[in-house]
Amino acid sequence: MRSIVLPSLALALFSQRARADTTLTIDPTSNWGTWEGWGVSLAWWAKAFGNRDDLASVFFSRNNQAVNGQTLPGLGFNIVRYNAGACSNNSYDGSTMVVSPNIKPSRQMDGFWLDWASSDPSSSSWNWNVDANQRAMLQKAKANGANIFELFSNSPMWWMCNNHNPSGSGSSDNLQSWNYQNHAVYLADIAQHAQQSWRIQFQSVEAFNEPSSSWWTAEGTQEGCHFDVSTMATVIGYLNTELSSRGLSSFVASSDENTYDLAISTWQGFNSSTRNIVKRINVHGYQDGGGRRDTLYSLASQAGKRLWNSEYGDSDASGKSMYQNLLLDFTWLHPTAWVYWQAIDGAGWGLIVGDNDNLTLSSASTKYFVLAQLTRHIRQGMQILTTPDVNTAVAYDAGSQKLVIVTANWGSAQTITFDLTRARTAGSNGATVPRWSTQTGGGDQYRSYTDTKINNGKFSASFSSGQVQTFEVSGVVLQ
């Protein structure tokens, strides 16, 4: 379900640089929106490592930070997705949580609402002291500069589930019909408690995670829950009411489908009332090179909705797959934010290699440094310009008159020339263009250079195969 199936056009664009040196022309008239930022989900890694100040610094600031003996450039994530857990180990009225035999303890996120005896969040049916590490990292992220927070759910509390198993029940709805509203109450109460007691204001609340998928089974490896589209619509209505009744400014985001095509189908299945409630469409990037990103963008744009790629992950530690899929998003999906899934994990998935159950850390993967090229330079508030090809992202900071270009070369070594002459002011002749280099095949991890000059609105740089570079051009006025 996570194989890479690139359409023929995208394959041609990815591979064309192998044939000849390239000139890329920047379009100063383009504008795909204001960038909201880069982010990460806290489940599951923060349950394990949420007490670590060094990890908070390396993920949420742009400071250089030593982690496990390796000095890393901070990624500067400003978006945090906090997970509302579904698990508890208590018994009530003869019922206890059913646990999948295949779920790791690190993936069982503690929930606050322990039983159905009372909906009063100040009662003994609630325990606000659980999930200490994830809550700690939430605070550390804020202290390091994170400023957009989302609350999301992978599954309702176990006792709201038909089979009392928060890992799911396959292709059938696992949320009990009499608990549709309670799932919304649970999320709204967390949002209210966070605002009052944690001083965290969730910009958005998401009640689902890949809800149309059928792989959320009782023997699954993580929390999950299938929702039919009609059930989603009902819960969305309840969630909007519960947030509003508490005087919260948090809005409803939906539906975090696994693929672009599922997101299209779900959105088209909502009636106008449900669409009016949803203020942002969240989608996951697990269709890799497939799917109609362009169609989903058109639907969101026509409806006046924001659009995020709210979760992406893959097992390619080199960062190449991530970069290619992310640039397809920039080319066709045009999200205003992009969120990685597991900051710490094994088997290529983690930006830093680690084991969330054994609490061990290794080193940063090459993927970490590839992502740093984007997150450290394309920053919140910048204007996103048209990609001159599917390997290149371009952003502009009007306040500092700085143009940021991030590009990768996956073919043979070559020289790439960047043409800024369509801009009103294309930098100063002879000015230095700082660049940062990551060589995915070995060499530079994240190294800065000052050996590039701009003349007559153009500059050139040599690229080895598998090299990602960022350039910052000062003194640029687009129009």
UniProtKB/Swiss-Prot annotation:
Notes on temperature effects: Loses 30% of activity after 10 minutes incubation at 50 degrees Celsius, activity is abolished after 10 minutes incubation at 60 degrees Celsius.
UniProt-annotated catalytic positions: E210 (proton donor), E311 (nucleophile)
Signal peptide boundaries: 1-20
Enzyme class: hydrolase
pH dependence statement: Optimum pH is 4.3. Stable between pH 3.0 and 11.0 in the presence of BSA, and pH 4.0 and 9.5 in the absence of BSA.
One matching Pfam family: Glyco_hydr_30_2
Glycan attachment points: N89, N271, N358
SUPFAM superfamilies: (Trans)glycosidases
Entry EC number(s): 3.2.1.164
Keywords attached to this entry: Carbohydrate metabolism, Glycoprotein, Glycosidase, Hydrolase, Polysaccharide degradation, Signal
Catalysed reactions listed for this entry: Endohydrolysis of (1->6)-beta-D-galactosidic linkages in arabinogalactan proteins and (1->3):(1->6)-beta-galactans to yield galactose and beta-(1->6)-galactaobiose as the final products
Gene Ontology terms: biological process: polysaccharide catabolic process
Gene3D superfamilies: Glycosidases, Golgi alpha-mannosidase II
Family in the record: Belongs to the glycosyl hydrolase 5 (cellulase A) family.
Task of the protein: Hydrolyzes galactooligomers with a degree of polymerization higher than 3. Hydrolyzes radish root arabinogalactan-protein. Does not hydrolyze dextran, arabinan, starch, laminarin, beta-1,4- and beta-1,3-galactans, larch wood arabinogalactan or acid-insoluble polygalacturonic acid.
Annotated protein name in UniProt: Endo-beta-1,6-galactanase
